[in-house]
A protein has these predicted regions:
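Generic N-terminal segment detector
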Residues: 1-47, 299, 312, 333-336
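Extended, loop-rich substrate-binding clefts of extracytoplasmic carbohydrate-active enzymes
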Residues: 1-10, 19, 87-88, 92-155
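Active-site/ligand-binding surface loops and adjacent short beta/alpha elements
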Residues: 90, 171-172, 181-276
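Acidic-aromatic substrate-binding/catalytic surfaces of carbohydrate-active enzymes
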Residues: 24-88, 294
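Acidic, contiguous internal or C-terminal segments within carbohydrate-active enzymes
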Residues: 18, 29, 40, 130-180, ...
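Short, hydrophobic/aromatic-enriched beta-strand segments in well-ordered soluble domains
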Residues: 27, 127-129, 264, 323-334
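Short Pro-Gly-centered flexible turn/kink motifs
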Residues: 82-91, 162, 318-335
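Acidic/His-leaning functional-site neighborhoods
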Residues: 23, 100-114, 231-308, 312-315
Length: 336
């Protein structure tokens, strides 16, 4: 496969097609710069959930359940309330069943393409969204910021970086999540029921019927939870409804690894989802376990972190001062 990076149209929509190191990636700038597709072409592994017939139509209709969307703000805020050190914001409730505000808004915005290029054996793309009074959500959240995404594809997989810059005169809460949807099964040789997930979980964070944290906010791992640690947690055929964990590191190929490892026990192939230390938590969800996907989601803060009466170092809550930036990085690759 030759290295290339170019803008094309897919399903009638402009996207960025990246090819490098035996991988194929498709970035959808008009849908939050979602990584709409990631494929290990050499080993015929479809890593992320992707609809081949109408990929962009499906993605646009359900941007949290295809590909790799970037969420700001992550997960749920109780009653739509966001408490910041210098203000309290009231967001519209968009999860009527539980009366929460969920998943933020950035994953639905149309980004500007800043750069599309190759550099040796690397394909590189970057996109940007400027959030200000022109955004329809600004009436609820009048805090200007800039969102920058960079994607680098090479033989080591997909490297992702996400930067938020506070362009306002207010404090800006910094919480990031990727609602990453992995394909089940990963290849034609695989069976969905044979997928297993490994996480370096150290504490379980229980939630109530509204999927909000409840005391005690951190519990010791049960026998069920230990399946994640051992890498024996099934992802399909039974419901997983927001298993939330604080994570540490584990050993992968003799190196410290912070993130999730997915094993296809049919073939032995592994998908490694490595995230930086800012992601202190993972939450796992599989839409009742009856679909063709499952979502291990890295989060920089736990659910409803801004509103919890807990120290910031416990919840992962962070704020950016005016003019301040913060970047997180991730990498997805296969081990065959």
């Amino acid at each position: 496969m030759n290295t290339s990076c170019k803008e094309i149209r897919l399903d009638g929509v402009p996207v960025i097609e990246m090819k490098a190191g035996g991988y194929l990636a498709i970035i959808a700038p008009t849908v939050g710069s979602n990584v709409a597709r990631l494929r290990d072409c050499n080993n015929k592994i479809e890593i992320l959930r992707y609809n081949k017939e109408r990929p962009m139509r499906k993605l646009a209709s359900s941007p949290c359940t295809y590909g790799m969307p970037t969420l700001y703000l992550p997960n749920r805020l109780k009653n739509g309330v966001l408490k910041v050190s210098d203000a309290t914001y009231q967001f519209p409730v968009n999860e009527g069943r539980f009366q929460n505000f969920i998943h933020g808004f950035l994953h639905t915005r149309s980004y500007e393409v800043i750069d599309v290029k190759t550099d040796g054996d690397k394909a590189i793309a970057s996109t940007r969204y400027v959030y200000d009074e022109k955004d329809p959500f600004f009436e609820y959240y009048p805090v200007k910021f800039q969102s920058d995404l960079e994607f680098i594809l090479d033989e080591n997989g997909l490297n992702y970086s996400f930067t938020l810059t506070n362009q306002s005169d207010k404090q800006m809460p910094y919480g990031v999540c990727n609602h990453t949807s992995f394909q089940a099964p990963h290849s034609k040789k695989s069976l969905a029921k044979d997928i297993r997930l490994r996480l370096p979980a150290v504490k379980r964070l229980p939630v109530d019927f509204r999927q909000l944290p409840i005391p005690p906010y951190k519990k010791e791992l049960s026998a069920y939870d230990e399946n994640y640690v051992k890498g024996t947690a099934h992802m399909i055929k039974f419901p997983i409804n927001n298993d939330m964990y604080e994570i540490d590191t584990m050993d992968v190929e003799g190196k410290k690894f912070h993130g999730a490892v997915i094993t296809d026990t049919t073939t032995g192939n592994r998908i490694c989802y490595e995230v930086d230390d800012a992601f202190k938590f993972f939450i796992v969800w599989n839409d009742r376990g009856t679909k063709d996907y499952y979502c291990p989601e890295p989060m920089s803060w736990m659910i409803d972190a801004p509103n919890l009466d807990l120290p910031a170092e416990e919840t992962g809550y962070v704020e950016l001062a005016p003019g301040e930036s913060k970047t997180v990085t991730e990498r997805i690759y296969t081990l065959v």
